[in-house]
């Protein structure tokens, strides 16, 4: 294949095709002019012009990205994976295959869908591993009376959903906490997972983290393999599961999160300790009351980095 054919093939199959077409014509015409006289010059001219062409297109990502705080962008569903009896992992394709989403820890996205002519907005936290390229991943649990979650459950590949963000208030400073206690319930694990992925692998951040993760049944535990892998790989992270309706083989904690479990598994209230809570409203309210009894000051939602307790 000639250098010209290679350029045409490469550009026509990459995300900048519409942008590059005009510049490619100039790249093609020039080497054809020199083909019979200076074969070496053909390659030099082609490569130089192609580098300029592609670099210019690469810079254009900054002005045409997949997420904005102040406007909606539609992205297509590219993959859907069932991860539990009522929960799926949804993968949406970004505009560019090597685009990375820079979503601050603990932040979420606004998601908009149209159902029966009505636009509905919900908020979800991406579960992308840091530096993931080309796609956005969401974990969505389908609820019996959840209009939007049931809409997600019926999504087809290449169907579009609108996104806006990132949005949020949590600000984490690794210098403010030596120990971090986290209580998550159900799908509330998704923003927590984002926090864990940011802190735990960092060699500069050795904050000790203890997580209590509560669910209705063992089958409802989301991302369990990931959590167990983190706990095995990083000794400064511990995870404890609580199941409301266990099966016969379950040998962990049973029921709802209790005051005693918080005392047993989570760090005590201290100046350099923090507590994060993310779950259903009733669970959050109950856990906040327990936190009061344990000496934590609560009711914080600002997330300015000095709050002792933060509720997602």
From Swiss-Prot:
Transmembrane portions of the chain: 15-35, 42-62, 180-200
E.C. numbers: 1.-.-.-
FAD-binding FR-type domain sequence ranges: 70-173
Cytoplasmic side: 36-41, 201-312
Gene3D superfamilies the record matches: Nucleotide-binding domain of ferredoxin-NADP reductase (FNR) module (3.40.50.80), Translation factors (2.40.30.10)
Phenotype when the gene is knocked out: Increases frequency of mitochondrial genome loss.
Keyword Membrane: yes
Cofactor list: FAD
Xref: InterPro entries: CBR-like, Cbr1-like_FAD-bd_dom, FAD-bd_FR_type, Flavoprot_Pyr_Nucl_cyt_Rdtase, FNR_nucleotide-bd, OxRdtase_FAD/NAD-bd, Riboflavin_synthase-like_b-brl
Source domain of life: Eukaryota
One Gene Ontology molecular-function label: cytochrome-b5 reductase activity, acting on NAD(P)H
Example of a GO biological process term: ergosterol biosynthetic process
Keyword terms: FAD, Flavoprotein, Membrane, NAD, Oxidoreductase, Transmembrane, Transmembrane helix
The family this protein is said to belong to: Belongs to the flavoprotein pyridine nucleotide cytochrome reductase family.
The name this protein goes by in its record: Uncharacterized oxidoreductase AIM33
Organism: Saccharomyces cerevisiae (strain ATCC 204508 / S288c)
Name of the coding gene: AIM33
